[in-house]
Amino acid sequence: MNDFVFLVVACLLTAGTEGKKDGYPVEGDNCAFVCFGYDNAYCDKLCKDKKADSGYCYWVHILCYCYGLPDKEPTKTNGRCKPGKK
């Protein structure tokens, strides 16, 4: 009985919550957003427009990186960028 009550409480606490993730936001073609000139303001705005908490230009890859993206927002995977394929 105690296990059942614990399970119900755990389900109620997690119901309706949306997780957040960090990563490189992409379009449908698995191409990340390039930030020429290391433009942190551009990346921060791009990330916030995608409902992330914040973002910056990761200078090593010259790509925008976001913190706190919604789970439904696509992020870069190991596959190659395929421009034009959405």
UniProtKB/Swiss-Prot annotation:
Named from the GO MF annotations, one term is:
toxin activity
Location(s) in or outside the cell:
Secreted
Signal peptide (residue range)? 1-19
Question: From which domain of life does this come?
Answer: Eukaryota
Just give the chief location class. secreted
One BP term from GO: defense response
UniProt keywords (A-Z) are: Amidation, Disulfide bond, Ion channel impairing toxin, Neurotoxin, Secreted, Signal, Toxin, Voltage-gated sodium channel impairing toxin
Q: Which SMART domains does this UniProt record tie to the protein?
A: Knot1
Q: Name one GO cellular component term.
A: extracellular region
Q: Does the keyword Disulfide bond apply?
A: yes
Which part of the chain is the LCN-type CS-alpha/beta domain? 21-82
Disulphide-bridged cysteine pairs: C31-C81, C35-C57, C43-C64, C47-C66
Which Pfam families does the UniProt record give? Toxin_3
CDD domains cross-referenced by the UniProt entry = neurotoxins_LC_scorpion
Carries keyword Cytoplasm?
A: no
- What's this chain's function? Alpha toxins bind voltage-independently at site-3 of sodium channels (Nav) and inhibit the inactivation of the activated channels, thereby blocking neuronal transmission.
Family membership? Belongs to the long (4 C-C) scorpion toxin superfamily. Sodium channel inhibitor family. Alpha subfamily.
Note on domains (UniProt)? Has the structural arrangement of an alpha-helix connected to antiparallel beta-sheets by disulfide bonds (CS-alpha/beta).
Designated name of the protein: Alpha-toxin TbTx5
The taxonomy runs: Eukaryota, Metazoa, Ecdysozoa, Arthropoda, Chelicerata
